[in-house]
């Protein structure tokens, strides 16, 4: 049968040439595997144009015979010596009763057993020749042998030669198709010519005699959605069918071929079968293995198929920036029909595929391990036409609705048998579907994987001293070029540090501004980065670890990074101990088995040991005790350290007296503005209990306690007394406290810094002019901001790098037109802002172009006069004084034409490096730049 179908799906581009080549290859295979059957020659001939052969499981040879005028079934029975009961057994499905068959009129068809008919010659016709006619056929039929090739008509012509000749004809057809470059109109004309050619119709008819041919031709969208399939038996007996199946299809702009083989075993009431297929996607270079099983009965079909990839990851044929490969999976299919109403059928399909990004529905909707169930109904009012509707529902509520109409033309049946409803029933029986195509998914379902088009790597962590600037080494691999890197440095910013762009033209040139070292803190910060390319793709997140060292530490040195006590005070009874812990690291990594020496810097006390080795965590401990009240400072040092690291002072106190056991400040720095205060708190204890209403005397060597250098405060119920210290000038202060005749204790030194400021005047890099920022800009022009106050170390930050970037020295680069805020943070955590206001205009140097092209590039926004550019030169100096233009010796720019210049074909120019204003320059002069005004 030949089946034509039409569907509602939209398809794309068709490669007709590949389809026809694949068809020729399939036919060549068919002739090869069937050469023994053809050589036998018993069943392959025709008896006139209206009598055709049909292979059958019960009667291997049947003849469809059209009654002539004056003929009856009884006449045939008598003249051909065929029993009437035999004829009736072959025609039960054509006539309602034997009596109706006997009344068959001229023009109606009767099926006769062909083995009863004598013949003298049988052979395979040549492509394009008229049908061969068997001698001694049915009365009234001509038995004339038509003209053939001389070799074929010779008396010694063998069946093998006939086979070889036919195979050569098929191969020749394929070769012709291969040698042509088929375009749209030519392909259509060629297809129509082949369809109308006698050789083609003979070829289709022969194939129909020995299997099933199904053609689905989509005429719209360049034939996308079209397919051809052939099931070709190469061994056929009543109980077993061995077959090959070839197919080709062009769906979703992919050309796919299928080649398979299988066996079907027929039992009295059912059929069991298996098959193996190789599926090849020639467009995308994907290969898949399919293994399937079948179980059929009358009015029922079921099959199960497994699909296994045979090709790996490679660049996708039609999905940009993705790799693809076949997805492994399976499906289970059921088809059923009502015996009482065989025109109505139903189907059920479940399919499951495996992979992270599988395109079960389409390549734009990728899913993980998707599955789908399909239910459908179809209606076949006559054998020629089948209409259906399928609904598929899958993972993630994806769904698909398909309407279809198929036209099935069977060459082995008369026209009347294809348009009358009573013949539908035969299609649903086991015998009638013996040569049906294997039910499977011939399209390769694909799995996709995003290509590594953009990757970011930071090979080294950063270790540096406080307030230092450290360059960040980045490794970026990008298919489309790096656009920007986005950082999350919130942890670093919380302590006064930051990640910032260096101000160069490279999008990956970043540096870390390290915060102050925090005594007793972790001083380890985690920041993350993500890269973006020019197409909007993003990389993976990458983490950078930054370790801040104190000023006394050296990078790559095995040294003490932390030295702390477990408590701030102890009883001066020579028994109560304070335990110190020293942490030893190298570049942020803990170091084991490192000797650490300990020493008493000030005060009177006794160490438990003078040295200790670090454990697996890089920690070494020592104890301290004393019998003398007072403060004690202890230090720790490794052999590689040039200076020791001091711990905070601890207090030993006489518990029998009211004694200060703790003194601390709430911060170590403050602004020297007379308002920013540092609060001190002392705690007074006696016999382990807080002392209430105890007078405490505070004194300072710098700053004031409410206008005084010495003052008193009284403790509360919790034994605590507080006081605040301010200063109107920068300097360092040490506060001490005493109670009655107790020992004096001192707090850690604090610092007052001048208020952080940014000067409103800027330094223009190109002309060394200091003044207000010009309100007309040169793109990539640079100026320097000057900060003062704070601790003297500053980190800079731009809130919008597309407008301006700023480097570690405060040098600003103007990238685009707009307003932006630049912030500076000092090491003592003061922050100040500088607002850059949008200019009245900015000029942008593009590329060299003729005047007309320059107008197009700038969208007609060229400088209106030479003055526009001379003002830029006066404000910013020569353009090549800036890093972006440093390699250029000349930037001659077009000026927008006046009306008179337009008539003359000339324009004016101005050079942004040498000035040199010129009038009357020909508009086709090369080496002149398009400089746009924004």
Swiss-Prot record:
Query: Which SUPFAM superfamilies would you find in this protein's record?
Result: C-type lectin-like, Invasin/intimin cell-adhesion fragments
Q: What is known of its domains?
A: Has a signal sequence, a periplasmic Lys M domain, an inverse autotransporter domain (residues 210-411) predicted to form an outer membrane-embedded 12-stranded beta-barrel, followed by a linker domain (residues 412-449) also embedded in the outer membrane, and an extracellular passenger domain (residues 450-934) with a tightly-folded proteinase K (PK)-resistant, non-Big domain (residues 450-550), 3 Big domains and a C-type lectin domain.
Q: Where would I find the BIG2 domain in this sequence?
A: 787-833
Q: How does it assemble?
A: Homodimer. Interacts with Tir.
Query: What protein name does the entry list?
Result: Intimin
Which GO terms are recorded in the biological process aspect for this UniProt protein? cell adhesion
**Disulphide linkage map:** 858-932
As recorded in UniProt, coiled-coil segments are none
Q: Where is this region: Sufficient for homodimerization?
A: 40-153
Q: Where is this region: Required for periplasmic localization?
A: 40-212
Extract the InterPro entries matched here: Big_1_dom, Big_2, C-type_lectin-like/link_sf, CTDL_fold, IAT_beta, IAT_beta_sf, Ig-like_fold, Intimin-Invasin_domain
Additional remark text: 'Inverse' autotransporters have an N-terminal translocation domain followed by the passenger domain, as opposed to 'classical' autotransporters which have N-terminal passenger and C-terminal translocation domains.
Q: In which organism is this protein found?
A: Escherichia coli O157:H7
Task: Quote a single Gene Ontology cellular component term.
Answer: cell outer membrane
Q: Region annotation Intimin receptor Tir-binding: residue ranges?
A: 747-934
Ranges for domain Big-1 come to 560-653, 660-753
């Amino acid at each position: 049968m030949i089946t034509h179908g039409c569907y509602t799906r939209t398809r794309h581009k068709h490669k007709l040439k590949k389809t026809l080549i694949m068809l020729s290859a399939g036919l060549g295979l068919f002739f090869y595997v069937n050469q023994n059957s053809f050589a036998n020659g018993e069943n392959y001939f025709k008896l006139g144009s209206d009598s055709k052969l049909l292979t059958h499981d019960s009667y291997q040879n049947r003849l469809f015979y059209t009654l002539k005028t004056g003929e009856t079934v009884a006449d045939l029975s008598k003249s051909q010596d065929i029993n009437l009961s035999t004829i009736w057994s072959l025609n039960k499905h054509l006539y309602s009763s034997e009596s109706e068959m006997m009344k068959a009129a001229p023009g109606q068809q009767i099926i006769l057993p062909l083995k009863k008919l004598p013949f003298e010659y049988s052979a395979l016709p040549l492509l394009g020749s008229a049908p061969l006619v068997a001698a001694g056929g049915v009365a009234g039929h001509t038995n004339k042998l038509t003209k053939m090739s001389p070799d074929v008509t010779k008396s010694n012509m063998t069946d093998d030669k006939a086979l070889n000749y036919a195979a050569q004809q098929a191969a020749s057809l394929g070769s012709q198709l291969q040698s042509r470059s088929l375009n749209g109109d030519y392909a259509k004309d060629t297809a129509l010519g082949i369809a109308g050619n006698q050789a083609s119709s003979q070829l289709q008819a022969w194939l129909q005699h020995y299997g099933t041919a199904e053609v689905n031709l989509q005429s719209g969208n360049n034939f996308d959605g079209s397919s051809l399939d052939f099931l070709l038996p190469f061994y056929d007996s009543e109980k077993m069918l061995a077959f090959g199946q070839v197919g080709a299809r062009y769906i979703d702009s992919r050309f796919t071929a299928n080649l398979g083989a299988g066996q079907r075993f027929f039992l009295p009431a059912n059929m069991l079968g298996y098959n193996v297929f190789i599926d090849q996607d020639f467009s995308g270079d994907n290969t898949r293995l399919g293994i399937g099983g079948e179980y059929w009965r009358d009015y029922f079909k079921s099959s199960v198929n497994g699909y296994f990839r045979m090709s790996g990851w490679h660049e996708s044929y039609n999905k940009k920036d993705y790799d693809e490969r076949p997805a492994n999976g399976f499906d289970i299919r059921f088809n059923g029909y009502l015996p009482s109403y065989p025109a109505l059928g139903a189907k059920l399909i479940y399919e499951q595929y495996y992979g992270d990004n599988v395109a079960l529905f389409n390549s734009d909707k990728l899913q993980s391990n998707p599955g789908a169930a399909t239910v459908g109904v179809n209606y076949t009012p006559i054998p020629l036409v089948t209409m259906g509707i399928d609904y598929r529902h899958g993972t993630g509520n994806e769904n698909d609705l398909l309407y279809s109409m198929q036209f099935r033309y069977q060459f082995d049946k008369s026209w009347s048998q294809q348009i009358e409803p009573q013949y539908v029933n035969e299609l649903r029986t086991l015998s009638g579907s013996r040569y049906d195509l294997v039910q499977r998914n011939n399209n390769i379902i694909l799995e996709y994987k995003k290509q590594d088009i953009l990757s970011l790597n930071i090979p080294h962590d950063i270790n540096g001293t406080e307030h230092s600037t450290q360059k960040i080494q980045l490794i970026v691999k990008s298919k489309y070029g790096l656009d920007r890197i986005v950082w999350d440095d919130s942890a670093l910013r919380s302590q006064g540090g930051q990640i910032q762009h260096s101000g160069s033209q490279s999008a990956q040139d970043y540096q870390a501004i390290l915060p102050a070292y925090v005594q007793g803190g972790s001083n380890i910060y985690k920041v993350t980065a993500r890269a973006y390319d020019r197409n909007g793709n993003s990389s993976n997140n990458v983490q950078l670890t930054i370790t801040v060292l104190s000023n006394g530490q050296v990078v790559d040195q095995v040294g003490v990074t932390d030295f702390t006590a477990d408590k701030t005070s102890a009883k001066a009874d020579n028994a109560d101990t304070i335990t110190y812990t020293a942490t030893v690291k190298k570049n942020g990594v803990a170091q084991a088995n490192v000797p650490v020496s300990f020493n008493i810097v000030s005060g009177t006390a006794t160490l438990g040991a003078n040295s200790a080795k670090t454990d697996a965590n890089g920690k070494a401990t020592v104890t301290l005790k004393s019998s003398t009240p007072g403060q004690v400072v202890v230090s720790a040092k490794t052999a590689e350290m040039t200076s020791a690291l001091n711990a905070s002072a601890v207090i030993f106190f006489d518990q029998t007296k009211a004694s200060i056991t703790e003194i601390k400040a709430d911060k170590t720095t403050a602004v020297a503005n007379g308002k920013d205060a540092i609060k001190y708190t002392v705690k007074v204890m006696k016999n382990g209990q807080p002392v209430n209403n105890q007078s405490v005397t505070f004194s300072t060597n710098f700053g004031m306690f409410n206008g005084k250098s010495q003052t008193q405060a009284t403790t509360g119920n919790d034994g605590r007394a507080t006081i605040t210290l301010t200063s109107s000038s920068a300097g360092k202060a040490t506060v001490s406290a005493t109670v009655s005749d107790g020992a004096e204790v001192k707090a850690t030194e604090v610092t007052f810094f001048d208020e952080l400021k940014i000067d409103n005047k800027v330094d223009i890099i190109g002309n060394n002019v200091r003044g207000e920022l010009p309100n007309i800009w040169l793109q990539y022009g640079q100026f320097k901001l000057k900060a003062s106050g704070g601790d003297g170390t500053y980190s800079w930050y731009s809130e919008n790098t597309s407008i301006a970037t700023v480097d570690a020295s405060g040098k600003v680069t103007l990238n685009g037109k707009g307003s932006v805020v630049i912030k500076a943070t000092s090491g003592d955590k003061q922050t100040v802002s500088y607002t850059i206001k949008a200019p009245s205009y900015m000029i942008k140097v593009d590329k060299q172009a003729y005047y007309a092209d320059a107008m197009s590039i700038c969208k007609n926004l060229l400088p209106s006069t030479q003055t526009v550019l001379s003002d830029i030169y006066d404000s910013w100096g020569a353009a090549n004084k800036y890093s972006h233009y440093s390699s250029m010796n000349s930037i001659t720019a077009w000026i927008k034409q006046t009306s008179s210049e337009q008539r003359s074909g000339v324009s004016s120019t101005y050079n942004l490096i040498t000035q040199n204003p010129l009038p009357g320059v020909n508009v086709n002069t090369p080496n002149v730049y398009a400089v746009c005004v924004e």
